[in-house]
């Protein structure tokens, strides 16, 4: 996708997926505006990775929005009294790492930011193949939110809508790693683990998904 002369707000968590989307946008010559959230997550270390990726790609602007979802919890990512699941990804089950309404909130804020700066796109690292079963990472969710974006702001009503850009939506993690290699994404600077420790736990769903892909690419874990 040619994004030259386009501007994009990228939801940049510091993880593998959002960092790869940032690399794709950079290679496509878009003006990139990064947006991260300090939402009371136990793995706040991801924000350091997000800042590192923003600097690596020399993006136009990078903002961290403080939005404390730990005030009401509801997820093991925002409530440390809840244990992280370590039994591996369970098919047809939404794990307790799901944060209620998180993507809806984040994309809504990104939509406001994008309209304020007259951006053309919102870049999201969601993918429907290698994910933990979250309801807000699926194609039907993205489709419906795009419909909402048409209706919910001035740009949409003037038939110049801000579009949700999801280049990874149909890719598995091995494919995403290939894109990361191809687009100068420093994998060792990204962060996926949910545990909140200084080093990846290797047991949470996010670590397991990443490790499986790493093994297929024969990447050593010390290159995490």
UniProtKB/Swiss-Prot annotation:
Family classification: Belongs to the QueC family.
EC number: 6.3.4.20
Cofactor remark: Binds 1 zinc ion per subunit.
GO molecular function: ATP binding; ligase activity, forming carbon-nitrogen bonds; zinc ion binding
Alphabetical UniProt keywords: ATP-binding, Ligase, Metal-binding, Nucleotide-binding, Queuosine biosynthesis, Zinc
Name of the gene encoding the protein in the UniProt record: queC
CDD domains (UniProt xref): QueC-like
Protein name as catalogued: 7-cyano-7-deazaguanine synthase
Main function: Catalyzes the ATP-dependent conversion of 7-carboxy-7-deazaguanine (CDG) to 7-cyano-7-deazaguanine (preQ(0)).
Protein's pathway: Purine metabolism; 7-cyano-7-deazaguanine biosynthesis
Cofactor: Zn(2+)
A single BP term in Gene Ontology: queuosine biosynthetic process
Binding site for ATP: 12-22
UniProt KW Zinc keyword: yes
Top-level taxon: Bacteria
UniProt binding sites for Zn(2+): 193, 201, 204, 207
Catalytic activity: 7-carboxy-7-deazaguanine + NH4(+) + ATP = 7-cyano-7-deazaguanine + ADP + phosphate + H2O + H(+)
NCBIfam families the record matches: 7-cyano-7-deazaguanine synthase QueC (TIGR00364)
